[in-house]
Amino acid sequence: GLFLDTLKGAAKDVAGKLEGLKCKITGCKLP
């Protein structure tokens, strides 16, 4: 349903932010 899709989108967004934060800390280069 819509709620689940929203939840998935939010989870993906958070995962992306965490990944970016990790890259800032470790200095890895995003493609």
From Swiss-Prot:
GO annotation terms (biological process): defense response to bacterium
Subcellular location: Secreted
Keywords (A to Z) from UniProt: Amphibian defense peptide, Antibiotic, Antimicrobial, Disulfide bond, Secreted
Location, primary (coarse class): secreted
UniProt key word Zinc: no
Family classification: Belongs to the frog skin active peptide (FSAP) family. Ranatuerin subfamily.
Name used for this protein in its record: Ranatuerin-2
Source organism (scientific name): Aquarana catesbeiana
